[in-house]
Structure formats: structure tokens, C-alpha cells
Amino acid sequence: MVVIRLARGGSKKRPFYSIVVADSRYARDGRFIEQLGFYNPIARGGEIPLKLNLESLDAWVAKGAQLSDRVKTLAKQARKAA
């Protein structure tokens, strides 16, 4: 099954997440099919906290990809901001 989920990056105590399309059997931070954007939960000042390609997201959902719970919430935020 294809899922759209967060892959953790960044350093210790400073998380940074990539929003990726991946097969559910792959490791969380492992192989992925496509990167759709990023999420920075501790963005400050002029940093961008969330960037998400909604067109690609909708295309993958139309193909049958499932969204993780957190990505659903982030997609709502991105649509509201757009």
C-alpha cells in the first residue's frame, strides 16, 4: 500500500520532517517514491514552517495513496493558508 507520511530528518532535539510518498513496507526514514514538501515544527522568525505541493498530493490520493493522520492535519493547514 502506498502511504503519504512524514520522514524525520534534522538533528537531535531539532526535528525536521519531509512529507514523502512511500510504500508502507519501507522504513520510516528509508526509501520513498516522491517528496511532496516539508514540515518544520520549530520554525522561528521568517522560516517557513510548512511547504506542501497540494497538486501532487491530490494526484497521489486519486491514485489510491493513504494519508497518515498527521499529514491529513498538515494538508488541512496548507489548504487553509493557500
From Swiss-Prot:
Indicate the secretion signal residues: none
Superkingdom of this entry's organism? Bacteria
Q: Which UniProt keywords apply?
A: Ribonucleoprotein, Ribosomal protein
Gene3D superfamilies assigned to the protein according to its UniProt record, in alphabetical order: 3.30.1320.10
**What processes does the entry annotate via GO biological process terms?**
translation
Q: Name one GO molecular function term.
A: structural constituent of ribosome
- Pfam families the UniProt entry points to: Ribosomal_S16 (PF00886)
Query: Would the keyword Ribosomal protein turn up in this protein's UniProt record?
Result: yes
SUPFAM superfamilies named among the record's database cross-references: Ribosomal protein S16 (SSF54565)
Cite a GO CC annotation: cytoplasm
Checking HAMAP family in the record gives:
Ribosomal_bS16
Q: Which PANTHER family match?
A: 30S RIBOSOMAL PROTEIN S16 (PTHR12919), SMALL RIBOSOMAL SUBUNIT PROTEIN BS16M (PTHR12919:SF20)
Hey, which family's this protein in?
A: Belongs to the bacterial ribosomal protein bS16 family.
Q: What is this protein called?
A: Small ribosomal subunit protein bS16
* Species of provenance: Alcanivorax borkumensis (strain ATCC 700651 / DSM 11573 / NCIMB 13689 / SK2)
